[in-house]
């Protein structure tokens, strides 16, 4: 693992400095080194780590990747039967390296596997992919440069360490010699307290968390002027979240990036406090340092300039591929170019993300990506959240419909149609609008377009037609 040699360095240079702080407990660099090194002799060649956020998690993770060891991080919130299934799969599928009880707390060979990552698939069992130590070392170098991570930063990633965004944030800080903080569980009040009292200068989180923290922070007069950097991933920042974040943390540069667990970083952009945002834009910036991006069709051929197709990346940050669950579609390669099937195009301003091909709406022979419609709707005053889908239609094949959650009071179809005239092309605008009491979300917490269509078909009380 590329951060273990760095832990040794920071423990020598700054033994009493804080390395990790979780739920009020702190570990200095010397303590982290000592506790992790003491665990290495009893740590097997392949570890499945399934723990809530804690100091012990950080120690065990460091020990679990010493030398040639490999680690799979499981979500403790998963059902016990699923956890047991994954543990069995890891133990039977992984190719363990030779390890010894006298191994030091040190990085293994750059090309060796250290991480067995788990990512949601179409089945109940997550897909598993593997990563080399070199891939994360290259990722660290790129992200530290792009996000401007400094040793005097204090990073707070309030989500679960089992999620790749937060696990990477921990490892990146250990590599950079910068303090990392998280919480036992996400709690708005606890995050606000950390921002106010624990010298936090940097937030790493998903857009839904940022919106909640910003809006409640503004209401509660929580001072976030000390935040220098906000890093978001997981979905595109909508206009309302961005506006609230800029008001709450007025001195922060807000970064968002596009990537995938299997690909690592692909593109990104940073918006300084003085820059105006691009309302409703699908652009997610320019290629990340060390990454090349192109758009290829399904045969692996370049599309015409500005054309839609598979977003493909070529870099040393890409994973090794799947350990299990490879359906031939989730991660595809065209020579040195790799894609997870996200669709987009390259414009003068950078890479534009349109979403997954499976979500595409085919209406009157035209392709419409609901992600683009949703971003435009979220930029409309009075809209708190939005979701678009393709409803079967005898005339068009499918027609674009949209549901919105109002931010306050009521909203009309006329208001929505008028607001989209200058943002979306005519053939991309919804033909029917619905007001929602809440977003349609699956049992796994994912927003579902199919569930929206089910609500509409069954006249669910959570959805009400606004007319055409």
Question: At which residue positions do the language-model features occur?
Answer:
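Conserved AMP-binding A3 loop
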Residues: 28-29, 114-141
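Conserved AMP-binding/adenylation subdomain of ANL enzymes
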Residues: 138-154, 162-202
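Gly/Ser/Thr-rich phosphate-binding loop
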Residues: 202, 216-279
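AMP-binding/adenylate-forming catalytic core of the ANL superfamily
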Residues: 203, 315, 321, 336, ...
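Conserved ATP/PPi-binding loop(s) of AMP-dependent carboxylate-activating enzymes
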Residues: 286-290, 301-331, 368
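Conserved beta-loop-beta connector loops within the AMP-binding
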Residues: 292-313, 348, 409-413, 448
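AMP-binding/adenylate-forming catalytic domain of the ANL superfamily
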Residues: 425-446, 466
